């Protein structure tokens, strides 16, 4: 996911929530 947050914004947001 890292480096592809633009293509996986939904997934990226989930990871940010985890942090």
From Swiss-Prot:
Main location: secreted
Activity as a function of temperature: Optimum temperature is between 20 and 40 degrees Celsius.
Post-translational events: N-glycosylated.
Expression sites by tissue: Expressed by the venom gland.
Keyword tags: Blood coagulation cascade activating toxin, Glycoprotein, Hemostasis impairing toxin, Hydrolase, Protease, Secreted, Serine protease, Toxin
Localization terms from the record: Secreted
Domain Peptidase S1: 1-19
Cysteine-cysteine disulfides: none
GTP-binding found in the keyword field: no
Entry GO MF terms: serine-type peptidase activity; toxin activity
EC number: 3.4.21.-
pH dependence: Optimum pH is 8.
Positions of transmembrane segments: none
Gene Ontology cellular component list: extracellular region
Activity regulation annotation text: Its proteolytic activity is inhibited by PMSF and TPCK.
Description of how the protein assembles with itself and partners: Monomer.
Function of the protein: Thrombin-like snake venom serine protease that cleaves alpha-chain of fibrinogen (FGA) releasing fibrinopeptide A. Has high clotting activity.
Name of this protein: Thrombin-like enzyme calobin-2
Originating organism: Gloydius ussuriensis
Record lineage: Eukaryota, Metazoa, Chordata, Craniata, Vertebrata
């Amino acid at each position: 996911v890292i480096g592809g947050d633009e293509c996986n914004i939904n997934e990226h947001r989930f990871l940010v929530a985890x942090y």
